[in-house]
């Protein structure tokens, strides 16, 4: 137990407009007990820890998921300290409310401005909560798909009441944060890499 190697913990910030279902998504992903009768209160700030199976030989990776207060009205920017520490961002919107998608463009611009030249994965989740009124939802989701393609970010359709819909976005994100170590086929390079790892230990 003392010799167990502790892997890097990926820090993921979940953000978006107030009332789009960020907390319900996280609670369902981590605990799996959210249903339409579950009472959730507006979030100030919460932290969840999830152990994620990325499907790579049974190895589990750890995500620390930060749930933030929803943005609304005049406050359409994330506080600056939220932009400094995350390794990845999950942007959530409700396709029934086009304003929630518009707000994500501002959040993404802030992330780009403060990322300090490092590659930070960003994922967009459409939290489809109601099956009624497909036309407005489809128009908003078409806009979201076009925007995500232009920004080169992944766009997923999920439902906070359906836990399996949340697996793919978070396992993919976790795999990007914890890439597999590749072994070189060149013996000389492999020897250099092994020597470097020994000197770092």
Curated annotation (Swiss-Prot):
The record's listing under SMART domains reads:
RAS
Q: Which Pfam families match?
A: Ras
Segments carrying motif Effector region: 40-48
Among PROSITE patterns, the record links this protein to:
RAB
Binding positions (GTP)? 16-23, 67-71, 127-130
CDD domains annotated for this entry? Ras_like_GTPase
User: What does the record give under GO molecular function?
Assistant: GTP binding; GTPase activating protein binding; IkappaB kinase complex binding
Q: Which UniProt keywords apply?
A: GTP-binding, Nucleotide-binding
Has the keyword Nucleotide-binding been applied to this entry? Answer: yes
Residue numbers spanned by region Small GTPase-like: 3-201
Which GO terms are recorded in the biological process aspect for this UniProt protein?
A: negative regulation of canonical NF-kappaB signal transduction; Ral protein signal transduction
SUPFAM superfamilies, alphabetized: P-loop containing nucleoside triphosphate hydrolases
Q: What is known of its domains?
A: In contrast to other members of the Ras family, the members of the KappaB-Ras subfamily do not contain the conserved Gly and Gln residues in positions 18 and 71, which are replaced by Lys and Leu residues, respectively, and are therefore similar to the constitutively active forms of oncogenic forms of Ras. This suggests that members of this family are clearly different from other small GTPases proteins.
* UniProt subunit comment: Interacts with NF-kappa-B inhibitor cactus.
Spell out the PANTHER family in the cross-references: NF-KAPPA-B INHIBITOR-INTERACTING RAS-LIKE PROTEIN
Name the family the entry cites.
Belongs to the small GTPase superfamily. Ras family. KappaB-Ras subfamily.
Cited function: Atypical Ras-like protein that may act as a regulator of NF-kappa-B activity, possibly by preventing the degradation of NF-kappa-B inhibitor cactus.
The protein here is known as NF-kappa-B inhibitor-interacting Ras-like protein
This protein's species is: Drosophila melanogaster (Fruit fly)
Tell me the gene name: kappaB-Ras
